[in-house]
């Protein structure tokens, strides 16, 4: 079938009108309505998004990122769970202050008994 088919433009995208017979035939043309290009390169594999934790600075390609003191998903899973536990125990304002105090110090993620004064290292 070597008939010229009209091209329809819709919303800035060009589509080729294909007869129904062509879609019913078997082969590479039948699957997409257009002939396959044998010279096309295979698709590149997707790579994960690399993020840095706003608290501990850990670089991970994790699927789970949690809300932190700054709001958006800026904490790794471990720091996010720690922050949530601080909120439950001391409230959001105190938890936010504590997270700012221990940021980047290498302090273990252990819930303190109380949040008075400054953090001891």
Swiss-Prot record:
User: Entry's Pfam families?
Assistant: GATA
The record, for PANTHER family, names:
GATA TRANSCRIPTION FACTOR (PTHR45658), PROTEIN GAT3-RELATED (PTHR45658:SF149)
Name the UniProt key words of this record, in alphabetical order.
Answer: DNA-binding, Metal-binding, Zinc, Zinc-finger
Of the GO CC terms on this record, one is: nucleus
- Region of interest (Disordered), residue spans: 29-48
Q: Which SUPFAM superfamilies match?
A: Glucocorticoid receptor-like (DNA-binding domain)
Starting at the broadest rank, the lineage of the source organism is: Eukaryota, Fungi, Dikarya, Ascomycota, Saccharomycotina
A GO term, aspect molecular function: zinc ion binding
Q: Which SMART domains match?
A: ZnF_GATA
The source's superkingdom equals: Eukaryota
Species name for this entry?
Saccharomyces cerevisiae (strain ATCC 204508 / S288c) (Baker's yeast)
This chain's protein is named: Protein GAT4
GO biological process: one example: regulation of transcription by RNA polymerase II
**InterPro entries in alphabetical order:** GATA_TF, Znf_GATA, Znf_NHR/GATA
């Amino acid at each position: 079938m070597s008939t010229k088919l009209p091209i329809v433009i819709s919303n800035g995208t060009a589509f080729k009108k294909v007869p129904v017979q062509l879609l019913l035939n078997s082969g590479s043309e039948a699957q997409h309505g257009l002939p396959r290009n044998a010279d096309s390169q295979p698709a590149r594999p997707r790579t994960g998004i690399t993020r840095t934790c706003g608290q501990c600075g850990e670089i991970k390609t994790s699927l789970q990122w949690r809300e932190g003191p700054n709001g958006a998903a800026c904490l790794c899973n471990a720091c996010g769970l720690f922050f949530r536990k601080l909120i439950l125990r001391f409230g959001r304002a105190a938890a936010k202050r504590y997270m700012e105090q221990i940021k980047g110090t290498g302090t273990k993620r252990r819930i303190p008994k109380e949040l008075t004064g400054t953090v001891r290292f």
